[in-house]
Every structure is written in structure tokens, then in C-alpha cells.
Amino acid sequence: MANINMADTAPSCDTYLLFNGETLLPNGVRAFIYTVVLAYCFIGLSAISGRFFKSMESIMRHSREVVTIDPHTNATIVKHEKVWNYTIADVALLAFGTSFPQISLATIDAIRNLGQLTAGGLGPGTLVGSAAFDLFPIHAVCVVMPRAGSKKKISDLGVWLVELFWSFWAYIWLYIILEVWTPRVITLWEALLTVLQYGLLLLHAYAQDKRWPYVSIPLARGDRPEDWVPTEDASVDYDDNYDGIGDILPGQNEDIVDIFSARSYSNEGYHHVSEKDVEESPTGLTLKNKWEDTHWFSIWWQQFVDAATLESSVSRKMDSTCLSVIGISWNLIIAPWKMLFAFIPPYEIAHGWIAFICSLIFISGIAYGVTKITDQISCVTGVSPYVIAFTALAAGTSWPDLVASKIAAERQITADSAIANITCSNSVNIYVGIGVPWLVDTMYNYLFVYKKPLYIDNAAGLSFSLLVFFATSFGCITVLVLRRVILGAELGGPRMWAWATSVYFMILWVVFVVLSSLRISGVI
């Protein structure tokens, strides 16, 4: 692997990051401290992803009032229609939002690199590594999420094929501009074309969803939920005097999940709107949320109360003392993050948009801290920043992707959103996550500094990682297709085959990481 030299300290390592006396500590101790802090930042990303996901659900519930006149009776018909399209929600909100840690990290790295002729290495390395993490470990988790024996398949195969095409084309395009068009150089036009292709992805996915002629694949759509928001596996009871805590009904068997999941179903300010909370008028056309009169300030205050509560209702219901202690300990560890994120306004305000934007701002702040910590780890250990980027950073910043896909795989009746989040996130990583930072750097260089393109310092290593990714991803997609043909679904099925598929996906990820690391280290 990479050459690690604890004895040598680069000049930049003389600056402290956490406290004044840290530069006097041995490099090994400093590396350990920075690694712990980095892991804690990833826990923060995991925690904020829960708030992000809930705010996104609130945005998706937003509907508009449509008034029509019955041509036969001249009666006025009032009904509510969803504002967001199902597919656009997957491509835009879900994929873009869960990829925001990688995007913000790459953008911050580019801004720090302004005025340089060579691009920063953290952004591209993280995004390619994140693509591998999204495709392999997240698929490995999702395939075992459905309950034993149950199956979940993609209902709209045409949309998935469109998203898969743009996902693979994104990395083919990246290889073309790195090795074929202008080898190891990024021009302003290449960066601009990269960003514009995200708009083409949105348009093509929407066209496929609407089955526009000539530009869509003529495949029938299977059954899928009318509402994008995942349905609950079990209802959640509330009383009229809301206290901020929803109790999970007995028999759900989610003790472990609720301890370690970033998005607990019990409290922490996330209030479910189950199907029975949505009432239908006698005409069957008007929806009413029974919580619409809840005062937002009391809900916001409840977020701080929940953040200060170490023992949740789930922990109190656990029969095992050990699990209860683990739950309390975990809540104690994440208490600072919970208290900080309690300042995010409730998602009930402005249909969740304020909470959505605030969540992205917090994610950007954590991503900036991650870049600084990574610089110090690379400095005191001698490990290549690129190796750190596509391993530790890629896994850590992809955690919101994992949480979102896991929740979708558990709660939705189809596999569309769980798998679409993976393929769309990989597309967003290139078109936005790499395109925008490179566009910022190339525009600055062309307009203000050198009048020259942007050079890629480690283009050979990046290109090799892309080739390995292509080879391993082909093996992944082939297995998903075989599961659909033989077992009838991409996710779930017999537990033995589900776990075998999961292990296979993890092996593919290990192969990618090992080969890419050996290439960067000069071993191969």
C-alpha cells in the first residue's frame, strides 16, 4: 500500500488544527487523534442525513390545488396533485442531496486550489471512490434489507435503464476527457459540458417516465406507489396532545436498527405522517393532514428536548439491558451533533425547504472540516491524499447515500428508489461533483490568472481506477440482472442467496480498493 513514514513531518504539519500543543505530539499520536475526529465527523454526516431525508419527504408531500369543472354536471371539482414528479424526485432531490457531502467536499477543495495550474486530488478521488462505494457496499446492504422471503424489484425498468446508461456514460465521459480528448488536461469547454449533462439526465429521465415517443424505451411500467414518500411497515400511534415521541408498535423488532440508524423512527424531532393521518373528504378528492394546525415553535423546542434526552422510548422498551446501555451510550456520543442539528427549523415550515437547505449548509460545514483533517492525516502519515480520498473519505461521505438507500429498501414496496439513488448518485458525482469544481477552477484560470487549462496531477491513477470500476461494475450489474431473471427481483429473496449476493458485492469493492491503492503506490 502507500508508503507511510511517521518520522518525517512536512512543513505544513507544523500548524495545529485542534489545539495549540498538538504539534508537539508524535506523528503516530496525531494520526490517531485526527482519525478519531474524522470518524466523529462521519457520525455527524450520518446524523444530519436523517434530517435531510425527512425534510425531503416533506417536500415530496407538497401538493397543489387543482380546480376543474365537470363537463357533465358543471360542478366544481377540487383536488390536490403532487408538485414533484416521482422520477425527478429520485434524480434531483434524493441523488443530489445524498451526494452533497461529496459535492461540497470537491467544491471546497477546488476553491482552496484556486489560482493553481493543477486540480486538487481530494475531490476527484473521493467521487470515484464514492461511486465504487455506492455501487458495491450499498447494493450489498440493500439486497438483504427486505424481510426473509420477501422480494422487491424495480417497477419502472425503463427509467432504471436510462439512469444506468447516464451513470456509466458519466465515467466513460470522464475517461475520455482525461485520456483521449485532451489527455491529463481539463479545458473550460470540457468542464462546462460535464455540468450540462446533468440537465440532459433530468430531461431524459422525465421523458422516460412520461413515455415520450422517440426518446423513451418502450417498456411497460409495473406497479409502484402513487406517492414517492416511502410507506411505513407498521403504523405509528399518536395522541392528540403531541409530545414529540412516537411509539413503535410491538413486534417490529427494530431495536438494533433504531440504535444505530441515523434516522430513528422514535423521536429526535422526526414525526411520522402515517396513512391514517391523511383523511379523505366524502368526495375522495381533498386531503387533510391532522397535524397542519400544530404550532411549529413547540415542535422546534421539542427538537432540543429530544437532543438532550439520552434514553429514548425505544431504549426504555428494550428487554436486553446490554442493548439499552448501548443505546444510551450511542445517544451520549451523538448528543453534541443532535444539539447542533436541533437548530435546524422543523420540516413542517415551508414544506420542508428551509430544513432541506439548512441540512445542506451543515453538510458543507462538516465537509470543510473533513478536508482540513484529511490534509493533516496525509501530512503526518505520508499516505497519499488520493488513497485517503477514495477509501476513507469516499466511505464516510457516502454514508447519507447508504442511509437513504437502506430506508428506501426497507420501506418502499419496490426497489426503484433504493437502486435509483445508487445509479443517480454516481451520475451526480461526475456531472456536478466533478464538473462544478473543475468549472470553477478553469473559469478562474482562464478569466483571471494563467489563460491556461487545468492540469490533472494524477490523471493516470484516476484513469486506472476508472478502468477497474468499469470491470467490477459490469460484474455487479450482471448479478442484478440474473437475480431479476432467476429470482424475480433485485432485492430480497431467499436469505442464502441474498447474503451470497451481498458478500459478492463486498468482494468487488475490496478488489477495486486494493488494485487502485496498489496503482497509486506504484506497485503495479
From Swiss-Prot:
Keywords: Ion transport, Membrane, Transmembrane, Transmembrane helix, Transport, Vacuole
Residue spans crossing the bilayer: 28-48, 88-108, 125-145, 157-177, 185-205, 325-345, 349-369, 377-397, 430-450, 462-482, 496-516
GO biological process, one term: metal ion transport
Claim: Mitochondrion is one of the keywords in the record: no
PANTHER family xref list: NA_CA-EXCHANGE PROTEIN, ISOFORM G, SODIUM/CALCIUM EXCHANGER
Role according to the record: Vacuolar transporter that exchanges protons with Mg(2+), Zn(2+) and Fe(2+) ions. May control the partitioning of Mg(2+) and Zn(2+) between plant organs.
Gene: MHX2
Cellular component annotations (GO), alphabetically ordered: membrane; vacuolar membrane
Subcellular location, record wording: Vacuole membrane
Domain of life: Eukaryota
Bilayer topology: Multi-pass membrane protein
Protein name: Magnesium/proton exchanger 2
Family in the record: Belongs to the Ca(2+):cation antiporter (CaCA) (TC 2.A.19) family. MHX subfamily.
